[in-house]
């Protein structure tokens, strides 16, 4: 478990700007703000995939499936 970022910075930054554009145009981001968003997003995704993998293992599978992600999110209380 390293602390290095898993997603390249520029593609993530473009994604953040693209999503933000839907809410307000001409937004500017400090580099530290984008980095904080990326660290939070990656931490969330890593945790979700860890839980998803546990769901697949519980079902006696080694391959994760969409239903594993759905179950993990439901157990976490993220989706009713």
UniProtKB/Swiss-Prot annotation:
GO terms for molecular function: DNA binding; protein heterodimerization activity; structural constituent of chromatin. The nucleosome is a histone octamer containing two molecules each of H2A, H2B, H3 and H4 assembled in one H3-H4 heterotetramer and two H2A-H2B heterodimers. The octamer wraps approximately 147 bp of DNA. Variant histone H3 which replaces conventional H3 in a wide range of nucleosomes in active genes. Constitutes the predominant form of histone H3 in non-dividing cells and is incorporated into chromatin independently of DNA synthesis. Deposited at sites of nucleosomal displacement throughout transcribed genes, suggesting that it represents an epigenetic imprint of transcriptionally active chromatin. Nucleosomes wrap and compact DNA into chromatin, limiting DNA accessibility to the cellular machineries which require DNA as a template. This is Histone H3.3. It comes from the Eukaryota. Gene3D superfamilies: Histone, subunit A. GO terms for cellular component: nucleosome; nucleus. It comes from Hordeum vulgare (Barley).
